[in-house]
Amino acid sequence: MQNIPTGVILLNMGGPTQTKDVRPFLYNLFSDREIIPLGPRLMQKPLAWLIAKRRAPKSAATYERIGGGSPLKQITEAQAEALEKSLQAHGNFTVTYAMRYWPPYCDEALDYLLSKGVERLVALSLYPHYSKATTGSSLTQLHKTLKKKNISLPLTEIPSWPKQRDYIAAIAANIKKGLATFHGEKTEIVYSAHSLPTSFIEAGDPYVEHTKQSIGAIEEITGKRGRLCFQSKSGPVEWLEPSTPDVLIQLAQEGVKNILMVPISFVSDHVETLYEIDILYKKQAKKLGMRLTSCPSLNTQEQFITGLRQLVLESSVNSD
C-alpha cells in the first residue's frame, strides 16, 4: 500500500478558534445525538440551540482565559504536517485533518486529498481510547460524507491505540521528567481522563478499559502507580467516577503534598488541559495545601509523531 497514493485523515473534535465561535460550536456539539440524545430526535436541534445559548457566556469566558480560543486547530494542523514529513521516507502519503464540531470538516479534508490524487484513505483517530461519543461519532460523520460525495476509495480505520508503544513511551518519559521537578519528594501521580456518562460504559463502550490499558502499560515503564479520575463532566446525568476535583480533596485528606497530573486521554492541548488542569485544578490543589504540576500534552513531540507514523504504516501493511 505504501506505493499507492494514500491520504491520511486525522480525526479530532475541533474547538472554537475565537470567542464569537463558542455558541455555534456548542450548538454543533449538542446537536450530535451520539454524545447526548436530547429527548425525541426532532427536539435535538431546538434543545441544542437553547443549551448553547445558555452555556455560551460562561464557556466564552473560559476560552478568554486561555488566549481567546482553542489552539486545537493549530496543533492538529502541526501534527498533520509533522506526520506527513515523518511518512515521506516510507511511501506516497498526504496527511490532513478533519474536525467533528468546527471547521475544517470531513468534506474539506476529502476534497483536499482527492485534489492530491490519493487512491486509498486511512482514517486515524486522535483519540487513543475508543468511545462512541468521540471516535465513533467522527467515523460516522466520515462515512456519511463519503457517501454524500459518492467516494468509494478503499478506507482503513484506526479507531483506537491504547497501548501503542511510542505513545506509551512518550507519556512515560513526560512522567519521569515531571517527577524530577519534585526533587525526590513523595509525589502522587494522578491520571485525569475526560469523563463520559456511565450509560455509555453500561452499553459496552470500551473507553474506560482502554484508558486503564494505557495506564497499565505506562506503569510497566515508570514503575510508579497512579490514580485514575475523570474531568469535564456536565449535565444532569450520571458520569464516570471519581471526578478529578473529588480525588484532589481525597488526596489532601490523605496528607498528600505533591501531585503530578497526567492528561491521559488528551494528546493535544485544549481547554481541558490549559484551563481545567493548569488553572482550575492547580488553584484547587493550592487551596488544599498541595502543589500540582501537570505533564505537558504530547502535541508534536517527536516520539508521539513516530507512534502515529507506525500506526499508519502498520495499517497500510495489514490492508494489502
Curated annotation (Swiss-Prot):
EC number of the protein: 4.98.1.1
GO CC list: cytoplasm
UniProt record similarity statement: Belongs to the ferrochelatase family.
List of residues binding Fe cation: H194, E272
PANTHER family according to UniProt: FERROCHELATASE, FERROCHELATASE, MITOCHONDRIAL
InterPro entries cross-referenced by the UniProt entry: Ferrochelatase, Ferrochelatase_AS, Ferrochelatase_C, Ferrochelatase_N
Pfam families associated with the record: Ferrochelatase (PF00762)
UniProt-annotated location(s): Cytoplasm
Involved pathway(s): Porphyrin-containing compound metabolism; protoheme biosynthesis; protoheme from protoporphyrin-IX: step 1/1
Keywords for this protein: Cytoplasm, Heme biosynthesis, Iron, Lyase, Metal-binding, Porphyrin biosynthesis
Gene Ontology molecular function: ferrochelatase activity; metal ion binding
Protein name in the entry: Ferrochelatase
Catalytic activity: heme b + 2 H(+) = protoporphyrin IX + Fe(2+)
Main function: Catalyzes the ferrous insertion into protoporphyrin IX.
Enzyme category, top tier: lyase
First-listed, main subcellular location of the protein, grouped into a coarse class: cytoplasm
GO biological process: heme biosynthetic process
